[in-house]
């Protein structure tokens, strides 16, 4: 990677149990650190507008915070129940939201319950108030020991940006010259979209978090980040998805207790490289469920996923990009990210892209590293069999596609495909794998019984040469 770092000598990226420096070696000058950030627990005191909860959930996801409690003015709980609920949540930050002046008394009562429930918590949670000035003054009078700050309406883009900025400031915890990993990834996605003059989706899975970022060529970026991962946060994936939903992606019969022990071992050995095919299959399964739940949470919070699904470029980073085979990275992304058109999927192994994004996030000039194009993915659901034409340096190949098809066509040199029903003609330079035609349908479903599920997974894995032969 060629990088102009100005006053920064190197970028140091923190992982679960190690740090990587780019460029490697001793730093002769200032070091910019990239960190995951601290866990921030957010509680919400809500007025009667039903859109407030969704707007706050969207803001919390964008800021990488955990939304641990929602308490409404009309939720039916008693004063003591509200106080106990907030005490158990142990929030670092409380956001009070009201758009209707009729909510003033109810919101002040919630603030009183907060003071009652969290009186012994140290430090006391800061309170961000997105409401009329008179309501903010009454909340300040009810909670004199808490720090009170004003916040714009979180239902607006400006309000969400202000909330995200405040959440990220708390996550840094005054750790000096640092950039949060999700900040760096968003800056990198923005730079890639501007350079490519096309929408870009970046999927990042690490041991402790998962990010889905959609960047447009006009510089607009929407990102969601959640503490679901394949290492220290693997148990959170299992808690959210359930062990059966993780196990369903493993192409062999595995007893639940043995699989659960492997999940918890991942937290004991952060950044460990999978030592067996089963361990690798588990990491891939956890990555699938982590991405799927982040997307589901984003949709529930009001984020429209249609523009992201239509993006022509998808880039994989983190542990997802460091899987031993490119086909492994590809199939994880394909199984859970439902693209609606032809997509060029690439991966950026290592930390060069994160380092470039960190520099860009701090206003430094950085040249993006080269990423590795894996495949052009053509997702289809034809009513009747259709023909896809693929042109590369060897000539033209015609592939007849019917529902349920899942095939890889190896290519050489510059590749262009022509699909029925669209004028878009994806084109790419040398691809590591080739063109993948996916007519499995969406949402992707697996048979519940092992006798049907395992052959289905084996067929999909064999099509892309995903796993070694002993598990097929």
Indicate where each model-derived feature is located.
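Conserved phosphate-binding catalytic cores of ATP/NTP-utilizing and phosphoryl-transfer enzymes
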Residues: 1, 27-38, 71-89, 116, ...
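Gly/Thr-rich phosphate-binding beta-strand-loop-beta motif of the actin/hexokinase/Hsp70
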Residues: 1-21, 41-44, 83-103, 192-219
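Short glycine-rich, Thr/Ser-proximal phosphate-binding strand/loop in the N-terminal lobe
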Residues: 3-5, 9-26, 64-69, 220-236
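Short beta-strand-loop/turn "lid" adjacent to the catalytic site in phosphate-handling enzymes
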Residues: 28-53, 321-325
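Well-ordered mid-protein domain cores that form the structural environment of catalytic cofactors
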Residues: 45-97, 101-103
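Short acidic, S/G/P-rich loop/turn micro-motifs used as interaction or catalytic elements
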Residues: 49-51, 76, 99-105, 134-135, ...
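Internal, well-ordered domain-core segments that constitute the primary functional module
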Residues: 82-159
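Helical "lid/coupling" subdomains associated with nucleotide-phosphate turnover
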Residues: 177-202, 206-472
């Amino acid at each position: 990677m060629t990088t102009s770092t100005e006053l920064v000598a190197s970028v140091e990226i923190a992982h679960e149990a190690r740090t990587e420096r780019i460029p490697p070696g001793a730093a002769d000058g200032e070091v910019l650190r990239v960190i995951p950030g601290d866990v921030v627990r957010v509680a919400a005191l809500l007025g009667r507008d039903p859109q407030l909860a969704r707007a706050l959930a969207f803001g919390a996801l964008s800021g990488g915070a955990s939304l641990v409690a929602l308490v409404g003015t009309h939720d039916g709980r008693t004063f003591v129940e509200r106080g106990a609920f907030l005490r158990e949540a142990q929030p670092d930050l409380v956001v009070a939201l009201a758009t209707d002046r009729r909510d003033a008394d109810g919101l002040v009562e919630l603030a009183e319950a907060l003071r009652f429930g969290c009186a012994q918590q140290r430090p006391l949670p800061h309170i961000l108030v997105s409401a009329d000035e008179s309501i903010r003054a009454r909340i300040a009078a009810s909670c004199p020991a808490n720090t009170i700050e004003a916040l714009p309406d979180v239902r607006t883009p400006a309000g969400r940006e202000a909330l995200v900025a405040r959440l990220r400031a708390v996550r840094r915890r005054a750790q000096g010259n640092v950039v949060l990993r999700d900040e760096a990834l968003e800056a990198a996605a923005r730079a890639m979209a501007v350079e490519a003059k096309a929408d870009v989706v970046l999927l990042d899975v690490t041991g402790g978090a998962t990010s889905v970022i959609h960047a447009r060529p006009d510089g607009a970026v929407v990102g969601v980040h959640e503490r679901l991962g394949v290492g220290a946060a693997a148990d959170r994936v299992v808690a959210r998805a359930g062990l059966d939903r993780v196990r369903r992606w493993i192409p062999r019969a595995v007893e639940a207790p043995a699989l659960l022990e492997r999940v918890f071992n991942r937290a004991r050995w952060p950044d460990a490289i999978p030592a067996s095919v089963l361990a690798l299959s588990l990491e891939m399964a956890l990555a699938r469920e982590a991405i799927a739940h982040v997307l589901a949470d984003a949709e529930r919070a009001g984020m429209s996923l249609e523009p992201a699904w239509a993006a022509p470029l998808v880039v994989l980073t983190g542990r997802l990009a460091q899987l031993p085979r490119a086909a492994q990275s590809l199939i994880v992304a394909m199984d859970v990210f439902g693209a609606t058109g032809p997509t060029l999927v690439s991966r950026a192994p290592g930390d060069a892209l994160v380092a470039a994004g960190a520099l860009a996030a701090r206003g430094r000039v950085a040249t993006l590293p080269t990423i590795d194009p894996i495949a052009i993915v053509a997702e289809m659901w034809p009513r009747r069999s259709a023909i896809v034409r693929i042109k590369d340096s060897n000539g033209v190949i015609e592939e007849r596609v019917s529902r349920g098809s899942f095939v890889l066509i190896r290519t050489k040199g510059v590749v262009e495909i022509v699909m029925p029903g669209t004028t878009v003609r994806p084109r790419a330079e040398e691809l590591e794998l080739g063109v993948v035609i996916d007519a499995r349908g969406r949402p992707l479903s697996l048979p519940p019984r092992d006798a049907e599920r395992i052959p289905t997974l084996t067929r999909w894995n064999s099509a892309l040469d995903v796993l070694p032969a002993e598990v097929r």
